[in-house]
Amino acid sequence: MKYNSSETKQWVKQLEGSSKSFENSQGLAVDSSDNIYVAGFTNGGLDGNTSSGKHDILLVKYNSGGSKQWLQQFGSSKNDFGLAVNVDSKGNIYVTGYTEGGLDGKTNSGERDIFLVKYNSSGTKQWTQQLGTPTFEEGNGVAVDSSDNIYVTGWTRGKLDTYAGGDDAIVLKYNYSGTKQWTRQFGATSFLEKSQYNQSSQMTTSADKGTGVAVDSSGNIYVTGSTEGGMDGNTNSGKNDIFLVKYNSM
């Protein structure tokens, strides 16, 4: 759906599969030419595509007038979900999310792996990266800096870097060619309150998940998400708190 700056609706587009299929959009990005990119998933086959498995990743490009330019559907024989999308200065598109299988000949590390896929502006796939542990990982946000390095945030239940326990937030940096530059993993520890049945406090692991990432003009990286604990000396005020973490360009 598009509105102009005066809040007047310009157009509405609806992407439909078969009567028995389920489609969902999760991510949205706009390039320098005002083309629009939507990432999500489907359990059917769209635009003549055949479903690879249970759920497939979707990437759709529209022009500024709302005309569909192309649609890409891809996945493994299992569940694959596109959750975020962004565009670099050259019009290349990056999609992240998670897969329960292996994409483009890659092997799944465990339950769920993070993926990062790059397409050019014409919709031709350039490369696929897949990363995981024997447990669970998800990619929830993707950003691109002025040098076209790519940053992915999400979470892991395993050890990609230093493991704090439970679900840890992560941020990954890839260069333009898809080579991973570094991984940062961080989390908190939370405490269970005393109960009427057990008067001793118990330490438990915290669920910490990165959901969004952005880069400023100096190359600093900002990650936001939620935590059940207290990060870097902060005190948790309830069940889930918002966090904001800044990294330098490294």
Feature roles, as predicted:
Residues 1-250:
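A sequence-level/structural motif corresponding to short, flexible coil/turn segments enriched
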